[in-house]
């Protein structure tokens, strides 16, 4: 009888590694499987078509309620690189579909988002809501909106102009464009441990930039000032020039729908105390709910995961994207929509 060959330690170790890799791969697949069905649609926009994704719940029967999403600042495709999928799923648990689109000029969408005003963005949301009301899979009597960051200068106008919204949800919304910019500048310098003379220099530079904006300076004049190194692009300067006077204060008394304001206590972009005070003073009584997320960042993510260059954040984004958000945030979305979106 031939003796059996012994399996060496190297092969055992290799087998263990393969099992672990397979298990990790299966885990990642499961964690990135969301209870929504994504359908690509084109919406007739006010200036150009909107290339959008309609995320429909995979469970239950239609027609569905609908949440229209409004992006924050910066380049954004319909899913915000996948960050919206846990949010879509949270709305799906309440029986609601979600609708979001590539910003103009992103992923082949026509136009250029840097050529837009906040009113232009509000008009896009209105167009999307009107389009959705004619869709057979959408219940035209159950509509809501969700917006993050810069979306806070977009959606209150929509919520004041329309009578067909069941709710509005805002995350990390600011009040005044210029005050928000200064708060963010101070917070970033504080995080860097910058000395006082550096802060003073940056505030003087900012004041000079604001003077140019108030004078309506063209791009060549801005470049000649040499205030920024590197300077903004021509399109970005135009975007700031178009929007730097944004202030939501006058819009808040016109809001006529239940509103959930979500604020992170570690938001370094927005002065959440100012935002909460303005909304409590402005939104009509009985319509506002404020939720402050402990350990929450500007985007309602866990602060420790939402910092530039965070390896833990990247791993969580890939392996467990729902866990990026502060525990309870996604459930709050579901619960608020269930309560007000029936």
Name these PLM-found stretches.
Residues 169-251:
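Accessory cap/linker subdomain of secreted extracellular hydrolases
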Residues 255, 261-263:
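Short beta-strand/loop motif that positions the catalytic acidic residue
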């Amino acid at each position: 009888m031939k003796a059996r060959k012994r399996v060496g330690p190297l092969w055992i170790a290799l087998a263990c590694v393969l099992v672990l890799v397979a298990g990790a791969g299966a885990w990642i697949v499961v964690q990135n499987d969301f209870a929504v069905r994504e359908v690509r649609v084109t919406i007739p926009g006010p200036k150009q078509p909107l290339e959008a994704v309609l995320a429909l719940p995979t469970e239950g029967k239609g027609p569905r309620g609908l949440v229209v999403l409004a992006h924050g600042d910066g380049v954004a495709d319909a899913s915000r690189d996948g960050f919206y999928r846990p949010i879509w799923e949270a709305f799906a648990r309440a029986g609601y579909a979600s609708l979001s689109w590539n910003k103009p000029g992103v992923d082949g969408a026509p136009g250029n988002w840097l050529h837009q005003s906040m009113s232009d963005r509000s008009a896009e949301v209105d167009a999307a809501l009107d389009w959705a009301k004619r869709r057979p899979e959408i219940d035209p009597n159950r509509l809501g909106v969700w917006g993050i960051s810069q979306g806070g200068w977009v959606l209150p106008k929509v919520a004041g102009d329309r009578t067909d919204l069941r709710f509005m949800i805002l995350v990390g919304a600011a009040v005044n464009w210029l005050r928000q910019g200064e708060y963010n500048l101070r917070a970033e310098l504080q995080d860097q441990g910058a000395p006082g003379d550096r802060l003073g220099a940056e505030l003087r530079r900012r004041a000079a930039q604001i003077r140019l904006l108030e004078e309506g300076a063209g791009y060549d004049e801005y470049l000649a000032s040499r205030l920024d190194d590197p300077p903004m692009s021509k399109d970005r300067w135009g975007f700031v020039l178009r929007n730097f006077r944004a202030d939501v204060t006058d819009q808040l008394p016109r809001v006529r729908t239940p509103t959930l304001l979500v604020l992170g206590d570690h938001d370094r972009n927005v002065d959440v105390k100012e935002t909460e005070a303005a909304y409590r003073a402005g939104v009509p009584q009985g319509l506002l709910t404020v939720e402050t997320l402990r350990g929450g960042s500007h985007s309602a993510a866990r602060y420790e995961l939402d910092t530039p260059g965070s390896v833990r954040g990247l791993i969580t984004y890939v392996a467990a994207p729902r866990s990026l958000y502060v525990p309870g945030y996604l459930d709050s979305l579901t619960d608020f929509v269930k309560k007000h979106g029936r």
